[in-house]
Design a protein with these regions (language model features):
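Amphipathic alpha-helical segments enriched in hydrophobic/aromatic residues interleaved with Lys/Arg
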Residues: 102-165, 181
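Sigma70-family region 2
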Residues: 75-79, 159-160, 212
Length: 281
């Protein structure tokens, strides 16, 4: 969680597409490991942006593009003085897949889009991302926003691979997969390790080791990320932070706020206000 007063973040959500635009500056530690349900497409404007993703440590510098798929765990730090500034688009998976399929007369293969690389340097793609970002952030004319997004999609299509919808890696321990399924089905409940161990038929210690090795997070951290992803969804649709905290099993609004800020760098109330255009509670 960032605490430096020099850090800041601005956010806007496009009413037509649901795309979020985020521009932020962080000094020191930016955010804890987390994931998003969206595709993240952005670029570093200034400084060095260091983050872990796909089991590797990446350092993005000005002009570099970063591409993160839904569900990919990543964090963020500023390893040098002066911090880093970035601009980013959050693209909903259903919107991206649907729009990509309209690019050609011939339908694309079934499946979902993915990125071959987390970091890349493509001047034409960088320009397309920046133009789409500014058109959405400035709430430009609808025809301007749509043209900028079409240009982005055309440039992005050359850097995507289409794959079958994700299947579990057969090498993953069955106990880890079963525990993950249980967490997804009961993420709003007060789940204990004993309960997960009983469901999977192994000890708490074996389960915790297998789960973290498989998914990169301990069971409790994974559960929190599930709740935070749902919290973003509910807040963006106007539900009050206190209500969201209660629905998702957080102890109270401040408990939700602490975890939300550690993952995303802003408060639930700020996120709700920027996405829903409702007054801050």
């Amino acid at each position: 969680m960032h605490t430096d007063d020099r850090s800041w973040i601005t956010l806007r959500q496009d009413a037509d597409t649901g795309i979020e635009t985020i521009r932020a500056h962080f000094e020191g530690h930016a955010f804890d490991p987390h994931w998003h349900d969206s595709y993240l497409i952005g670029f570093t404007e200034q400084g060095v942006q260091q983050f872990s993703c796909r089991g590797a440590l990446h350092k993005s510098t000005p002009g570099q593009i970063f591409l993160v798929e839904p569900g990919e765990i990543h964090d963020g730090d500023a390893p040098v003085d002066g911090g880093f500034t970035y601009s980013m688009l959050y693209l909903e998976p259903a919107w991206l897949a649907r729009e990509l399929r309209t690019l050609d007369d011939t339908p694309l293969a079934c499946g979902e889009p993915g990125f071959d690389r987390t970091l890349t340097e493509r001047p034409q793609l960088l320009s397309a991302i920046a133009n789409a970002f500014h058109a959405l952030e400035q709430c430009d004319l609808r025809i301007v926003r749509q043209t900028a997004l079409d240009t982005l999609l055309l440039n992005l299509s050359g850097h995507l691979r289409w794959r079958q919808e994700r299947q579990d890696d057969p090498r993953l321990p069955r106990v880890a997969i079963r525990a993950r399924e249980y967490l997804h089905a009961h993420f709003d409940q007060d789940i204990g390790l004993d309960e997960l161990a009983a469901v999977t038929g192994v000890s708490r210690f074996r389960l915790s080791r297998a789960f973290k090795a498989a998914f990169g997070l301990a069971p409790h951290a994974y559960l929190i990320q599930l709740r935070l992803a749902r919290a973003r969804y509910l807040l963006a649709r106007g539900q009050a932070p206190a209500e969201v905290a209660s629905i998702l099993g957080f102890a109270d609004q401040s408990h939700l706020g602490r975890w939300f800020r550690r993952a995303y760098g802003l408060t639930p109330a700020h996120y709700r206000t920027r996405c829903s255009n409702l007054p801050d509670d």
